[in-house]
Amino acid sequence: MNAFGVDISRWNIKDNVTPDWSTIKASCNFIAIRSGVSWGYTDNWFTHNWQGAQGMCRMAYHVIYFGEDATKQMDAMFKIVPGDWKHDRLVLDLEVHGGNSKAKITSTTRDCMNIIRSRTGMYPILYSRASWVNQYLDVKGLPDADWWLAQYK
């Protein structure tokens, strides 16, 4: 299935101008909204964007730092993201290796996935680039998951 969606975070918002939600809703199948990074950063536009995208298929994505504690990072994400896990999905953004080993990256990813599963009843979607996954992650060491692979043009 081909679906078109957009990724939105404070980086996409210029001069504090609110996104045009009617245009986004008319042209997209889903929207991915950044909630934060690791355990200590909240995207300051998340709540506004999450509310603006109400009625769409929404995904909240959280950037994981592999050298940090998985529970602490997931606690931070769940403080940011309100949950309606019947319709909305959580995404782990896997793209900053930080010099960690493949084993550490895989174990932290697995731990985060299992925490999300225990709190929501489903595994998160995993977001990355295929080349990054091939270089830094042992996919066989993870539970089955849906993938969102970036394709930059």
Predicted segments, located by residue:
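Short, well-structured secondary-structure segments
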Residues: 29-43, 50-67, 89-91
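Residue-identity detector for glycine
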Residues: 5, 36, 40, 52-55, ...
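Alpha-helical structural elements
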Residues: 6, 16, 45, 122, ...
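Short catalytic-loop micro-motif centered on adjacent basic/acidic residues
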Residues: 7, 60-61, 125-126
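Boundary/entry segment of secreted carbohydrate-active catalytic domains
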Residues: 1-38
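Surface-exposed substrate-engagement region within the catalytic domains
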Residues: 22-29, 74-153
